[in-house]
UniProtKB/Swiss-Prot annotation:
Biological source species: Ulva prolifera
Binding site for Mo-molybdopterin: 137
Requisite cofactors: FAD; Mo-molybdopterin; heme
Organism lineage string: Eukaryota, Viridiplantae, Chlorophyta, Ulvophyceae, OUU clade
Outcome, altering residue 662 to A: Loss of enzyme activity to 18% of that of the wild-type and decreased affinity for NADH
Protein's UniProt keywords contain Metal-binding: yes
One Pfam match: Cyt-b5
Catalytic activity: nitrite + NAD(+) + H2O = nitrate + NADH + H(+)
Biological process according to GO: cellular response to nitrite; nitrate assimilation; nitrate metabolic process; sulfur compound metabolic process
Function: Nitrate reductase is a key enzyme involved in the first step of nitrate assimilation in plants, fungi and bacteria.
Protein name: Nitrate reductase [NADH]
Effect of residue 835 to A: Loss of enzyme activity to 21% of that of the wild-type, but increased affinity for NADH
Similarity comment: Belongs to the nitrate reductase family.
Amino acid sequence: MGVRHSASKDYIAGRPLVPGEAPLDKKNSNFSSWKPVTEIDDRDAKCADNWVPRHPDLIRLTGKHPFNSEPPHADVMKEGWLTPVSMHFVRNHGAVPRLEWGSHRITITGLVERPMEITMDDIAKLPAVTVPCLLTCCGNRRKEVNMVKNSQGFSWGPGAVSVNNWTGARLSDVLKLVGVKSQAQGAKYVHFCGPKGELPKGVDGSYGTALTLGHALDPSMDVLIAYKQNGQFLHPDHGFPCRMLIPGWIGGRSVKWLSHLHVSDKDSQNWYHFHDNKVLPPHVDAESAAKQGWWKDPSFILKELNINSTISSPGHDERILMDQNRRYTMKGYAYSGGGRKIVRVEVSFNGGETWSHPAKIIVTETPNQAGKHWTWVHWELPVDTSQFFTATEVVCRAWDESQNTQPAVLTWTLLGQGNNSMFRLRLHKEVDPQGRLCIRFQQPAPILPGPLGNVGWREQEAGSAVPSAPAAVAAAAPGLDSTKKYVTKAMLEQHVEEASVWFAYKGKVYDGTKFLDDHPGGADSILMAGGEDATEDFDAVHSDSAKKQLEQFYIAELAPEGVPVPANLLYGGVDAAVVVMPGTAAAPLPAIDVDAPFLNPKKQKAAELKEKIKISHDVTLFRFGLEHDEQLLGLPTGKHMLIRKKVTNAEGDEEVVMRAYTPTTANETRGHFDLVVKIYKANVHPKFPEGGKFSQILEALEVGDTVEVKGPIGHFHYDRPGHYKNHKLESEVKRINMIAGGTGLTPMYQVMKAILSNPSDLTEIRLLYANQTEADILLRPELEALAKSHPDRVKIHYTVDRPTPGWKYSSGFIDLDMCERALFRYEPGTISVLCGPPPMLKFACHPNLEKMGFEKGVTSIEF
C-alpha cells in the first residue's frame, strides 16, 4: 500500500486541516461517512499525486495516472444511500492541484458592479447551505457503448455515481456580493473554470463551462460553491478548497478547484465547453464533427442528467443453485436529472416483453422546498429463484415524475456519453465445480472480469472475448506467460490519440499518455510512435537513463502476431487481436495524393541526397529531394523533423542513428529541403574525440544516397502573424527574443524568415547567438541581410568564446548584462525561445531570463 502520512492526525486526505476543522478520527461523527484513507497507494508513489491517499479498492480506468476511478458496483451499493468520500468515483484530467485554503482566490469579473478576488474565508462567511446531491459522470456505463463501437472516451462501468452531502455558499449569494448586473443590462450567463494550465487545449488550458444567470440566481436550483462534503472540507480529488455544485446536472459541469467566475452576455467560449459533454447524433464521427461544425452547435450540449437505472444484485459472475426454489432480493439504483423524482422501477424476466414486477423504492432523501430530488433511490425486488430458471434475460427500467423512462436499445454516439439504455442481465445455465446445476448471471460490461474470470456479455457478443475462462485455471496459448498480461497488435493500433497513446518497445507495451506534457521533445514525439513498435527510433535517440525511466509506463507484453490470447490474459480483459490468415488477399494500395505534403508523423519517408555544397571547412549544405518537384515538405514553423540512417558500427552490428533537424528552406519551398549542418569531425576537439556521430554520417553521404525522415515534431509552433502555440496553448506575441548556440540557430532562422517574409507580421526580433569562434557563426550573411532589410524590427548580437582582435560584439559565456543589452525585458506579449547545448540553456539562459521576468516553460521556451 505505501507509507502512512507522517502527520496523519493533522491531515485529511493528504491536505492540512483547515483552521478550525476537527481531525477526522474515530471520535469525529463524520468518520463513517468518509471512511478515510491515510496511506499513499504504491501506484501513486511516483506520480504528481503522491501526496493524495486513495482507497485501494477503487478501480483505476486510465492506468495509474491521471486518476479516474469508480468503486465496484456492488460495493458502493452496500454502503447505502450516502457514499463514503473514500469510495466516491473520481474524474481527473491530470494531476491534482496542491491548493491551500489560506492562499486560494476566486477571481470574479465581467458584468458585475464590483469585480474582485475573494478568499475562501470570504465564501465561508456567507450563509452555509447543505445539499444532498448525486454526482455522476456523463460517461457512466460508457463501456457498454465502447463494446458496440469505440467512442472517444475511456470506459466507465456502472459505478461512476455517488451521493454526498455538499456544503457551501449559494452561487446567488456570491453574485449578489459582487453586484451582478441584471439581464436587462446584458448579464445572461455565469462562466466558471478551474486552474489555468490544467489541460492541454484551449486558450489558457483551463476546464470551463457555464450556466444561465437565471439558473444561478434561482434558490430552488441549489447551485453552490461547495467547500465541504459529508461534513468535512473537501477531499483534494473532489476539488479542495472549492468547487461548483450544480445539482441535477452531469458531473462535468460541477467544475473542481474553482478559480474564476465571469458574468457575460454570451455563453462560455471555453474549448471544453464546446468539445466535451455532448450527445451528437449517432451518424456523426470524429471527422464530420470537426469539418461540419457539430461541436459548436449548442443543441447537443449535455446539461441535465437523463434517467438511468442498473441492477447490482445479482452481480456479475454470481451463481444461484437450481436445486430448489428460494427467495432472492434483487437490488439496484435509479436516478434522474433536473430534480425529477423517481416514481417506479420495473423488472422484466423476458427481455422486456412484459413488465409485471414493480420494485420497492427505498427513498432516503427529503426533497428541497421546491420539491426537487437531487439524489438517487435504491430499489429492491424479492423474487422466487424459480423465475430465473426459465429466463434468459432480466431487464430493469426506471420512470420519473415526468413519465420519462429508459430506451430499450443502446445508441452509439461519438463521445459515448449519456448511455441510459435499459440495463440487461444475461442468464446462463451451468454446472458448477461440485457438479450442481446453477444459473450464472452476466452483466453487460463490467470493468473487470468477474470472480469466475468472465467478461460482460457485450464484450462476448462483440466477439472480442472468451466467454467462460476462469482466471485461475485458463491455460495460456503457446508462447504466452500465464503470469503476464498482453496487448495484441490490433489493440495497440487503437491507442494513437492524445486521450490514450500506447507504443511498443522491445516486446513490451507502454502507456505514454501521462508523459505527453512532460516529454522534453513535446507530445508529438510520443504521438508519432503511438500504436507502433517504436524500438528502433527509441534506441536511436534515448539514453540508458531514459530507457530506465520508461519502466514506470509499462502496462503489458506485446502479444506475438497470430497467437490467440485468452481473455483472462488480455490487458483490460478485451481481446481485440486480429489474426491475418494465410491466403488472405492484401487490400489494394491507396492512390497517391499528389497534394499531400512529404512529412508523415506515422511513417518514415525516404529522401534522396541531390546536392552537397561546402559552405566552409566544417559546414555543409545538404539538399534532399522530395517525392516530386511540386511537393511541399509540410513542416509547421517552429517544429522540426527526425532524420535517421541505418549504419554499421565499429563492432560490425547494424544500428539506427537518428537526430532532430530544422531545415533552412522556407515552408513554401517545393521539391526539396536544405539542411545546413556543422560537421563535428573525430579527433579534432579534445573533449569530444569521437566527434558528432550523425553529422559525420551525413558528411559521408554521396549524392543519390537516402536518409529516412519522419515528422513534424515539437511543442512550439509559430502559427500565424503574432500568434504561437506552446504545447497547444495559443498566445499572442509582439516581441521575440531568440538565444541560439551553435547549430541551434536553424530553428531560429526558420521562424525569423517566416515572420519577416510576411508583410502583415509586425513582430519584433532580438537574436543573441553564441559560438566558439567567429568562423563558427552559421548563416551569418543571411542573418545580417535580414537585419539590414528590417532595421527597426531585427537586432542581432553575437558572443564567442575566443574572439579575434577587433571583434565588436561580446565574448564569453552568456550573462545577465549581455542579455539585458541584447534582448527585450519581459512584458506582456514578449517571449524568449532557446536552442543550444543543454549546459548553456540550464546555467546561462534560464537563470538570466528569469531575472528579466520570464517564466521557464511559459514565456521562456526551449525548442
